[in-house]
């Protein structure tokens, strides 16, 4: 299964990242109060998907890249 992991972004109340899969569509991420916590959670998500045998995990660095890969 392919997953696209978005960059950490500022949101109301903190920082978050989103994920997208062809099967489930967009999954909004939890909002963390500290940017360090959001980056840590994003890295854990990327590693856990890779370890579970995900066919392809793509970690995006920019919003433009995330949008381009999810349309």
Each language-model region and where it sits:
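A short, exposed loop/beta-hairpin motif centered on an aromatic-Gly-Thr core
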Residues: 24-36, 58
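Short amphipathic alpha-helices within nucleic acid-binding modules
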Residues: 38-40
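Basic, amphipathic alpha-helical segments enriched in Lys/Arg and hydrophobic/aromatic residues
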Residues: 43
């Amino acid at each position: 299964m392919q997953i696209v992991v978005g960059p950490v972004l500022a949101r109301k109340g903190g920082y978050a990242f989103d994920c997208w899969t062809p099967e489930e569509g967009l999954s909004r991420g939890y909002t963390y109060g500290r940017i360090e916590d959001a980056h840590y959670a994003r890295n854990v998500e990327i590693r856990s998907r890779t370890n579970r045998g995900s066919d392809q995990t793509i970690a995006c660095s920019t919003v433009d890249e995330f949008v381009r890969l999810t349309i």
